[in-house]
C-alpha cells in the first residue's frame, strides 16, 4: 500500500526532506505532499540583500514548482491552521484536511517580541521576501520624504538586534546609503543608521577580535551602535531604551529574536520552550511518526546545549530526515544525526565580512570572508539544483 508523507514548510529542512526522500521512494511506493505558505523557497540568509535592493527577488525566492519539477512531489500552497499528531491530521486554512503515515514539521520560527509594549505594532521584520521588499520600499520612501521635509525622524533608521540578521542588514543599508541619498539630493551623512542591542556586544557567536573588526568596519561607514541597551517600550516612532534615552525613528526594523512557531506547541508534540524535542534520529520524542527539522526542532548536542537554529543545521536535518522517513516506514535501521558546523559567516555589506570557518574555527575577515559567504550560498543552491536563481 502506498504511504503518504506530508511535509509542513518548504524552508531548508522541508525542501531537503522532500528532495531526499524521493531518492528512496518511487511515486508508486509513497506520495509526498509539501505544504507551504508561499509558492517560493526563500533563502532566508540572503534576505538582507533584498532589503537593501542589492539583488532581485528571484535570487532569494525560488519557485517551488521549478525546484520540485519532475520529482513527483505534490505541492500545496496553503497556510497550516493547525495539526494534531494524535489524530494524524493537518488542517489547512482553505478548509481542507490532510492525513499522513509520516509527518515532517519544518514550520520555521516566528519573531519574538519578548512582551515589550508597542514593539510588534510599531516595527517591521525581516522574515520573508515580502518583508524585505517592504523594508527597502519604506527606507527609500523615508529618504525621499526627508529630502522635502528635513524631518530628522525620516533620516533615522534603527535596527533592533545585533545578531546576524541585524548586523547584515545594517551593513547592506550602509553600503547603499550614499547612492540612495544622492538620488534624492540628500547628503548621506545626514542619514543616521543606528543598531540597538540588549546584550553587551554584537555578533556574540563570534570571537571578540572579529566583533571589534565588524564594529570598526560598520562605524567607519556611519553606523552607530547602542549596545547593552534593551528596548523597553515603543510608542509610534519613539523607541525607549533602558538607560532612559529615546530614539525617534520613522524606520524601525526588529530582528532581535525568534521563537518556535506556535502551531508546534499546540500540536500535541512534546516541546521545550516552544520547539519540538527530537531524538538522535530527528523523530519527535513523543511521536515516532513525526520528524522535525530546522527552527521547529530543538536538538541537544553532547554538551547538553541546543544546536543554534541555523540554515546549515536545517539543511543537514532535512537530508537525514529524507532517509529516515524511508527507514522508519520500511522498518529499516534509522541513521543518527551527526551535524557538521562548517562555520559562521557575517557579511558587512557588499565587500566586507567576518567569519569563523571549519572545525578549528579559523577566523576570516575582509574579502576572503565575503567570498566564503558567497560560496556558501552557491554551494547550497547547487545542492538543491537552484542555480537558475543566480541567473537573475
Swiss-Prot record:
Required co-factors: FAD
EC number(s) stated in the UniProt entry for this protein: 1.6.99.-
Pfam families: Pyr_redox_2
Induction / repression: By glucose starvation.
Entry keyword Flavoprotein: yes
Keyword Phosphoprotein: no
InterPro entries to which the protein is assigned, alphabetical: FAD/NAD-bd_sf, FAD/NAD-binding_dom, NADH-Q_oxidoreductase
Superkingdom of the organism of origin: Bacteria
Keyword terms: FAD, Flavoprotein, Oxidoreductase
Cysteine disulfide links: none
Molecular-function annotations in GO: oxidoreductase activity
Family: Belongs to the NADH dehydrogenase family.
Classification via PANTHER family: 64 KDA MITOCHONDRIAL NADH DEHYDROGENASE (EUROFUNG) (PTHR42913:SF3), APOPTOSIS-INDUCING FACTOR 1 (PTHR42913)
Name of the featured protein: NADH dehydrogenase-like protein YjlD
Name of the gene encoding the protein in the UniProt record: yjlD
